[in-house]
Amino acid sequence: MNLMNIEQNAENLRLLGLIVAQRGETIYQHNWDSPCRRLLFSASKSFTGAAVGFAVQEGLLRLDDRLIELFPDEAPENPSENLCRATIRDALTMCIGQSRGYLMGAQRVGMAEEDWAKAVLALPFDEAPGTHFVY
């Protein structure tokens, strides 16, 4: 891979940034645009699903692990029963227990909380996890 070629053609490729890692070490990193939140639309689901699949295969987590146990520092002080029952499987199937989508369009851009996990876990979980699909 010729990284100089990539740098020279980055504008034509419309790259925002590039990180190359080898054996767990970052060997190259360059940003062509300033860091900011980007809407990735449905691409996020593909990356997340693949990452979770690898983590399950490596024994790092299970689909039935509870979100509250994976994100204890991001959880609200008094989590609801529904939030306490929500699992990775529920998150991957978009059935974590919320009755409506809270992070669509302008809501996402205007969100004050920088920590996405903390922001999502602070939202109401008013449905039983696994029972109500919300995009």
Q: Where do the protein language model's features map onto the residues?
A:
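Extracellular/periplasmic catalytic domains that process cell-envelope and extracellular macromolecules
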Residues: E11-N12, N82-R85, A112, D126
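Short linear capping/connector segments at secondary-structure termini
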Residues: N31, C36, R66-A75, G105-Q107
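A short, mixed-charge helix-start or loop-turn motif at secondary-structure junctions
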Residues: N5, W32-S34, E77, P124-P129
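Catalytic tyrosine of NAD(P)H-dependent dehydrogenase/reductases that use a Tyr as the general acid/base
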Residues: F41, F133-Y135
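Short, charged, amphipathic alpha-helices and their helix-cap/turn boundaries
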Residues: E25-T26, I68, M104-A128
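A short, well-structured edge-of-sheet supersecondary motif
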Residues: L3-S34
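Active-site SXXK
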Residues: G24, L39-D64, A91
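Active-site helix/loop module of the DD-peptidase/beta-lactamase fold
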Residues: E58-Q98, A122
